[in-house]
Amino acid sequence: MNTASCEKEAPSLSRDEAIAILDTPDEELEALIDRASSLRYKYKGNRVSIHILTNARSGNCSQDCAYCAQSCRSTADIDKYKWVDEDKLYQDNDFVNDYHLSRHCIGLSGMKFTDKEIEELARRIRKMKEQGTHLCCSIGFLTEHQAKVLKEAGLDRINHNLNS
């Protein structure tokens, strides 16, 4: 492994550049993926980062992704809850830090969230961030205001978890 390549800082994308990538025509996706892979290798090397995922909201998603147990239409035998027990969330966060994992990912089923729900999530993020944990969320649609609230709470990354 070439560790020198791991020390380089990857360039950031502007909002317009990110939107242009999202608008990539299907026939150009393979070339885009190839380029993304070469950039990943250039800036991150041949490394693996280990994350832990806490299912913070389970089931009752309004989306109807046929393969997904989180869908409200799914007959899968899963636990369904609006919020995972806070102790579980914080225990998982401790695990990330105790074992020097790369990131704590918080997954939430659902398409949209109220501002009150986002504030509750932000409260939990602030508490976990006190330990210096790198945090990300796999979450549905957010308003610009909601994204700012989560960022200000200390969230490092957002993954849009919706599919069609």
Regions found by a protein language model. Name each.
Residues 21, 53-54, 139:
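Glycine- and other small-residue-rich loops at beta-strand/loop junctions that grip anionic moieties
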Residues 1-30:
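Auxiliary Fe-S-binding modules of radical SAM enzymes
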Residues 14, 74-164:
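Conserved Radical SAM active-site core
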Residues 18-21, 32, 121, 150:
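A structural signal for short hydrophobic/aromatic patches embedded in well-ordered alpha helices
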Residues 29, 61, 114-118:
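Alpha-helix N-cap/helix-start motif
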